[in-house]
């Protein structure tokens, strides 16, 4: 059995990107996190047996807000590396979307996905 803990569509406003408008005006970002805890199946009904998703959420918002990033790829890597090094997980997948990326044309979003395995 494999357990996955997911937080979908964390919405945060930030000033990440390479363009001047992105850096001055900012935009909405959407972030998904998926982790596989070391203990796939907890042996008791105890939070200490797994990964507390409220801590994962706090980790994401802290890293996102701590500084401005040019590349969302680098930001996604930073989040994934921090989570895999700080929490008892076998893997961490981070997806970051820019719904309003500065591209002329019709599209839903620009997205990067990073997977970090321990």
Q: Where in the sequence are the language-model features?
A:
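N-terminal, polar/charged subdomain of small-to-medium soluble alpha/beta proteins
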Residues: 1-118
């Amino acid at each position: 059995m494999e357990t996955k803990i997911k937080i979908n569509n964390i919405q945060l406003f930030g000033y990440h990107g390479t363009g001047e408008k992105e850096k001055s005006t900012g935009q909405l970002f959407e972030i998904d996190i998926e982790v596989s805890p070391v203990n796939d199946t907890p042996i008791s009904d105890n939070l200490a047996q797994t990964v507390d998703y409220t801590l994962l959420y706090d980790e994401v918002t802290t890293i996102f807000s701590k500084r401005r990033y040019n590349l969302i790829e680098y930001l996604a890597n930073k989040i994934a590396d921090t989570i895999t090094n700080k929490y008892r997980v076998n893997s961490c997948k981070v997806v970051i979307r820019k719904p309003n990326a500065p591209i002329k044309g019709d599209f839903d979003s620009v997205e990067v996905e990073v997977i970090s395995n321990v």
